[in-house]
Amino acid sequence: MIRLRRLVHSVLSVGLCVVLVYVGWLMGESHRVVTFKLMPVALVVGEVEHPAHVVQRGGRRWAAEVISNRGVSGRIGRPGEQITASIGTLMDPLASPHFLHVMEGARVLVSEGWGQRIRMVDTQAMRVIDLPTASDLSLNAPHGICVRKNGEWLYIADSLNSRLVRVSLQSQRWQVFPDHDRRVAYGRQLLCREDGLWLANSYENRVGLHPGMGSNVLRINDFESGRSEVMAAFDDANMTGLEVVDDRWLLVGLWGQRQTIGVVDLLSESAVTYLPPRDDIAGPPYGFFFDTTSRELLVAYLGDIRGRSQTGGFAVYHVPHR
């Protein structure tokens, strides 16, 4: 059973709602209801225009601006202290920053979603450092990026090459995921988790991409094995971002006929729950970030990136403990 409740408040001049998603599941002979809650805290518009991804750590947020080719940083709750990082130079600008990964030592990795590189931002000096990679890596529109804690490898969804690669942060070594099942097509957000790599993967009508229909979430336990597992599939929509909450709830951003957030209970065989599309912000839900300390979920909304008639922003939700 799915039950939706909405309670409207005024926070930062933005209407908020409480969305309750109820997922019924069957265990043995007993039937009980398990609840997943998303409680909106704020909707931030105006500070960023077309963000693909927003992340936070240590009281500060970073946003990747797709159209303006910039990174934006600011303290949480203090919009007047926003800092804009000049990414690159006029002669060497960033080609549409898409996804971010916060590393140790005040460094943030940024993918060039419409370019060929991964860049590193020194957030203390607010300057950009080119990340050294092998000259023959030849990335094409890299999107999702992630690094495991204390890990050697940077994992990259190399979207227009229809592949998943990893690059050593200690040397010039790099490897391509063998993908024996030919499932990887146009990868967007990528998560590095203890239980493997999770990829938001879409089958789009583009030359050179692996064929397929709709989109799916792939999990890869062993990179060198070349094998992947389909965790969820959507026949009628492309996929943007994803996040896994409490090792149970898979959240995905959907673009197309369903321009909303889908919720999958990984511990049951129940159907996907689709949250109501938001009518207070433009564009599809794109990059996701779950802060396990504050239990805040940040969802970036692109706005209208084609006609550019409407800007986007990001929503902040609180996820209560079950």
Predicted regions and their residues:
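N-terminal Sec-pathway targeting helices
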Residues: 1-17
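Conserved beta-strand positions in repeat-built beta-propeller and related beta-rich domains
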Residues: 63-70, 110-116, 156-160, 199-212, ...
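A short helix->beta-strand "capping" segment at the edge of beta-propeller domains
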Residues: 29-48
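Blade-level signature of beta-propeller repeat domains, shared across WD40, Kelch, NHL, RCC1
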Residues: 285-322
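Short loop/turn segments that connect beta-strands within beta-propeller blades
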Residues: 77-82, 122-126, 168-172, 221-225, ...
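Structural motif
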Residues: 71-75, 164, 207-217, 258-262, ...
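Beta-rich, blade/repeat-based domains predominating
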Residues: 47-57, 91-103, 136-149, 181-194, ...
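A short beta-strand motif characteristic of beta-propeller blades
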Residues: 39-45, 83-91, 127-135, 173-180, ...
